[in-house]
Structures are given as structure tokens and as C-alpha cells.
Regions:
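Interfacial segments at transmembrane-helix termini and the short loops linking adjacent helices
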Residues: 40-74, 148, 185-190
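Membrane-interface helix-loop junctions in multi-pass transport and translocation proteins
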Residues: 95, 104-137, 178-204
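Helix-loop junctions and terminal segments of transmembrane helices
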Residues: 1-15, 21, 85
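Membrane-proximal transmembrane or re-entrant/amphipathic helices at the cytosolic face
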Residues: 150-151, 175-241
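C-terminal transmembrane helix end/exit motif
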Residues: 129-180, 208-221
Length: 241
């Protein structure tokens, strides 16, 4: 995004720069929001399959999964900040992001200390997520205040649609987990030969549900995806030439 924004701004193409920023935020939301919901719903089976063996017990899996859920909540804001920060760098403003980072560091440290006592390791993870939203708020406010960029009503609608699709996907995955629990009683007692296919099935079910919902709500447009892929292909061909 940084070289694209720099090119548009140097050429005086303000609207093109705004459009590129909108697309970056939209694609960031399209990737991060569904991933957040999936990580929250599938945290327990993911940790159980990857790590529960040897001295890593079932209780350790549960505790780790809780931390993963707490971290996952902040994933969209992490991604959005990465999409918004280049807007400052493209204008030669490197001081503002540093100031924002200092504020976030202080907020993260303060919240970690405050939440660690009542909630333990989950409190520390939650503090990191909350601090990421503080960072996102700073960037949104700073960009709007300087007139660099502000999200449009259309972008807001798309993000709401993505959130809706993600929640439906999460609900379907959760129902699938309930079905597995009803059928097999206890996930922790299953062998890996059964767990892995069931987990893969839940993932496929989630992806299929999101794609169907995204198509119905107009979130995914095949022509836009093809244009993006073709433009990347042309750029790669030019670099190789």
C-alpha cells in the first residue's frame, strides 16, 4: 500500500489515494473479521489438536485457548492499523505513528497490570487487544482531523456486511461443534484420527458458509477479485521483465 499511496500523492491524485486506502481497509476487514470469529469459535479444538500431548494437559489447552480468544478480539484492529499507518508514511509523517505507538505502549502496560491480578494471563491478552483498539482510534481520528482520509458510508456498510457474514459463519461452526459434542460426548477423549477430519470439516463448513453469505450480501465480487489478481500478475510480469 505504501508505494501505491506515495505514487498517487506525488501525482496529486487525491481521490485515487482515498480509493486505494478504502480498498486496503476493506480487504483488511474481509480477512481479519472472519478470522477473528473463527479463532474465537475454534480456539479449543485448534489448541487441543496442535499442542495437547505429553506434559501439555487438557487443562493447559483450555487455559491457552482462553488467551487465544482474548488475543483474537484485537485482530481486526491490528490489521486495520497496518492498513492505515502507510497513509502517514506516504506523506513523510513518521512522527505521528511513533507518538501513537508510545500511547499504545503505555495503555497496554497499564491495562496489563490492572487486568493481570483479577484475570491472570487472559487479562494480559485482553489488555493487548484493548490497546490495539486504542491504536486504531488514534489513527482514525488523526487521519480524519488532518483531512488525509475518513471512512465513507459505503465502506461502513461493507464492514457491517462482513461482520454479519462472519457472525453467521461463527454460528454455523458453533452448531457443528454442538453436533460433534452430541455425537461423541467428549472431544478431549477422541483420537487424532477422528479429531483432525472433524476439525477439517468444521473449517470447510465455515468457509463455505462465509462464501455463500458474502455472495448473497454482495461482499464478495468476483470481478473485483479477478481485477486484483490480474493487476498483481501484470506487476509481477513487469518486475520479471
Amino acid at each position: 500500500l505504501l508505494p501505491i499511496l506515495s505514487h498517487h500523492l506525488k501525482a496529486g491524485e487525491i481521490e485515487a489515494a482515498r480509493h486505494s486506502q478504502n480498498k486496503a481497509v476493506e480487504y483488511g476487514a474481509l480477512l481479519s473479521i472472519p478470522a477473528t470469529v473463527a479463532l474465537i469459535v475454534l480456539a479449543y479444538p485448534i489448541i487441543d489438536i496442535l499442542f495437547r500431548h505429553g506434559r501439555f494437559t487438557a487443562e493447559d489447552s483450555v487455559m491457552t485457548a482462553r488467551a487465544v480468544i482474548a488475543y483474537s478480539v484485537g485482530l481486526p484492529s491490528y490489521v486495520m492499523v497496518k492498513a492505515l499507518a502507510p497513509n502517514f508514511f506516504a506523506r513523510g509523517d513518521t512522527k505521528t505513528p511513533v507518538k501513537y505507538s508510545i500511547v499504545v505502549m503505555i495503555a497496554n502496560l497499564s491495562l496489563s497490570i490492572a487486568l493481570m491480578i483479577p484475570f491472570g494471563h487472559v487479562g494480559v491478552a485482553s489488555a493487548t487487544s484493548v490497546a490495539s483498539f486504542v491504536s486504531l482510534y488514534q489513527y482514525l481520528r488523526g487521519l480524519k482531523k488532518r483531512g488525509y482520509w475518513s471512512y465513507s458510508a459505503e465502506l461502513n456498510r461493507k464492514i457491517l456486511k462482513i461482520t454479519l457474514c462472519s457472525l453467521v459463519m461463527g454460528g454455523v461452526i458453533y452448531l457443528g461443534e454442538l453436533g460433534i459434542t452430541w455425537k461423541f460426548d467428549n472431544w478431549l477423549l477422541l483420537s487424532y484420527g477422528i479429531k483432525i477430519p472433524l476439525f477439517a470439516g468444521l473449517c470447510i463448513l465455515g468457509v463455505a458458509t462465509f462464501c455463500v453469505m458474502a455472495k448473497l450480501t454482495g461482499v464478495l465480487c468476483l470481478t473485483d477479485i479477478l481485477k486484483m489478481l490480474s493487476s498483481r500478475g501484470k506487476k509481477n510480469a513487469q518486475k520479471q521483465a
